[in-house]
UniProtKB/Swiss-Prot annotation:
Biological classification of the source: Eukaryota, Metazoa, Cnidaria, Anthozoa, Hexacorallia
UniProt function note: Pore-forming protein that forms cations-selective hydrophilic pores of around 1 nm and causes cardiac stimulation and cytolysis. Pore formation is a multi-step process that involves specific recognition of membrane sphingomyelin (but neither cholesterol nor phosphatidylcholine) using aromatic rich region and adjacent phosphocholine (POC) binding site, firm binding to the membrane (mainly driven by hydrophobic interactions) accompanied by the transfer of the N-terminal region to the lipid-water interface and finally pore formation after oligomerization of monomers.
GO biological process per UniProt: cytolysis in another organism; monoatomic cation transport; pore complex assembly
Quaternary structure (record): Octamer or nonamer in membranes. Monomer in the soluble state.
UniProt name for this protein: DELTA-stichotoxin-She4a
Gene Ontology cellular component annotations, sorted alphabetically: extracellular region; nematocyst; other organism cell membrane; pore complex
Comment text on domains: Composed of a long N-terminal alpha-helix and a core region rich in beta-sheet structures. Before the pore formation, the alpha-helix binds the lipid membrane, partitions into the lipid-water interface and stabilizes the monomeric molecule on the membrane. Finally, it traverses the bilayer, thus forming the transmembrane pore.
Superkingdom of origin organism: Eukaryota
Mutagenesis or variant effect for residue 16 to Q: Shows larger hemolytic activity in human red blood cells, but no change in capacity to form pore
Organism: Stichodactyla helianthus
Length: 176
């Protein structure tokens, strides 16, 4: 059974799990496996995903309880097209705010790199071009195989990593 689009125990979110998610996508040159561990103390409800380029084969897991992790994936569009997997997605949090997540796995590494970021928006906000641009052109993290952490505000913090390859893995933990 496919892992992407499912919820697992937060403690079991590992790179090995993300490797399995990548494997589910088959032989695609630009793809990403995303795992986000909810240790926020609250419940998240999926709003939507916005793909600037590329697509996904799975639905965002609808409800992510505390101590659970969501698994998601994206890939370049099928066929001989020069696109990457570039998207933002949003979860409404039980604290009344929105968790926004952005990733960019480009087609052309001569000009672009992997980038990612996480941000909390006040109130309920769906992912769209504006949310993507806000994070991509803000102060995103490079997908360089390094761990990063920051204070997200609202009593929450983030720790995460994204790999540098065209078959990318992104692992994030949101905690108090």
């Amino acid at each position: 059974s496919e892992l992407a689009g499912t919820i697992i125990d937060g403690a079991s979110l590992t790179f090995e799990v993300l490797d399995k998610v990548l494997g589910e996508l088959g032989k695609v040159s630009r793809k990403i496996a995303v795992g986000i561990d909810n240790e926020s103390g609250g419940t998240w409800t999926a709003l939507n995903a916005y793909f600037r380029s590329g697509t996904t084969d799975v639905i965002l897991p609808e409800v992510v309880p505390n101590t659970k992790a969501l698994l998601y994936s994206g890939r370049k569009s099928s066929g001989p097209v020069a696109t990457g997997a570039v998207a933002a997605f949003a979860y409404y949090m039980s604290n009344g705010n929105t968790l926004g997540v952005m990733f960019s796995v480009p087609f052309d590494y001569n000009w672009y790199s992997n980038w990612w970021d996480v941000k909390i928006y006040p109130g309920k906000r769906r992912a769209d071009q504006g949310m993507y641009e806000d994070m991509y052109y803000g102060n995103p993290y490079r997908g360089d195989n390094g761990w990063y952490q920051k204070n997200l505000g609202y009593g929450l913090r983030m720790k995460g990593i994204m790999t540098s390859a065209g078959e990318a893995k992104m692992q994030i933990k949101i905690s108090r």
